[in-house]
Amino acid sequence: MTQMEYIPIISDSTSSFKSYDPFPLELGGELPELKIAYRTWGTLNAQKSNVILVCHALTGNADADSWWRGMFGEGKAFDETKDFIICSNVIGSCYGSTGPLSLNPKSGKRYGPDFPRITIRDMVAAQRLLLQSFGIEKIKLVIGASLGGMQVLEWGAMYPEMAGALMPMGISGRHSAWCIAQSEAQRQAIAADAEWQGGWYDPAQQPRKGLAAARMMAMCTYRCFENYEERFGREQREDGLFEAESYMRHQGDKLVGRFDANTYITLTRAMDMHDLGRGRESYEAALGAFTMPVEILSIDSDILYPKQEQEELARLIPGSRLLFLDEPYGHDAFLIDTDTVSRMACEFKRQLIVDN
């Protein structure tokens, strides 16, 4: 599968930012050139003070109005009548930004497994370049969950002068051994597929079984025991499959039709490197240096990023506020109960106005 084949999935409203200057990477090396796919909603005001930056999760893209639809609308978290909302596809992904499916200008061939190791900090540095192209010097609110929440926190550490307020959801300040183990198991599922070929597979014949298995494993951590029991129980279909089995297979097949195996490995490895304290004085000092308003959303039923991790963030970030989403949906609750998440974000935005 080539990047061109993803175009039908990408909205016609998607724009591209291109930089032909070498883009240095945190772990060494560089990208010879950079392309960032992004979308915007609303109008940037004259003061450029109404910017909301939305950061997407692992398999997301710039089409935030599709995967986070319930957050958009007048009077909601992302109000196009008042806000200028921007969401970019992270580098390393496969929805229009530079990633493993892109052509390496030095070789004329796709990067594939030779795509350089990237980090969350590289993603944020690329987003900053995009915002600077608009002349934006201050972001009213940076918001996101999961991988998006990692980006939100790094905005606070890397560019505190730009990040006016942060709302990270369902995330920790450093990737746990539990999460790293989950990601490695998923990567090994991909590598076990005979079509993997060390990552040099034909793009039209990627390791579908391995990628589907990786997605199924991930889906077990995106929900929770109560959710699966209530939704599926021990119900069986006419073909003999348990409903839970059928759901897993459906989720695996669905991802294979819209994602790339090398991309999955690139992004999960970037997540493994997530640690606000890495290369800084200490983890505690990095979070303790935050001075902007921060509202942390924790999901009670999240087994991937359990609430003690958000409680730790709240203890270490001065003046931060911790909210709980009490829903039996697991980690994915931020995508499901958008009414509550939007209401919390709106209240945070109103408080920012009062405080200013």
Swiss-Prot record:
The active site is at S146 (nucleophile), D302, H331. Signal peptide: none annotated. Pathway: Amino-acid biosynthesis; L-methionine biosynthesis via de novo pathway; O-acetyl-L-homoserine from L-homoserine: step 1/1. Residues 50-335 form the AB hydrolase-1 domain. Coiled coil: none annotated. This is Homoserine O-acetyltransferase. Transfers an acetyl group from acetyl-CoA to L-homoserine, forming acetyl-L-homoserine. It comes from the Bacteria. HAMAP family: MetX_acyltransf (MF_00296). One of its GO terms (biological process) is homoserine metabolic process. PANTHER family: HOMOSERINE O-ACETYLTRANSFERASE. Substrate binds at R215, D332. Belongs to the AB hydrolase superfamily. MetX family. It catalyses: L-homoserine + acetyl-CoA = O-acetyl-L-homoserine + CoA. One of its GO terms (cellular component) is cytoplasm. The gene is metXA. It is found in: Cytoplasm. Homodimer. Its main location: cytoplasm. Keywords: Acyltransferase, Amino-acid biosynthesis, Cytoplasm, Methionine biosynthesis, Transferase. Its EC number is 2.3.1.31.
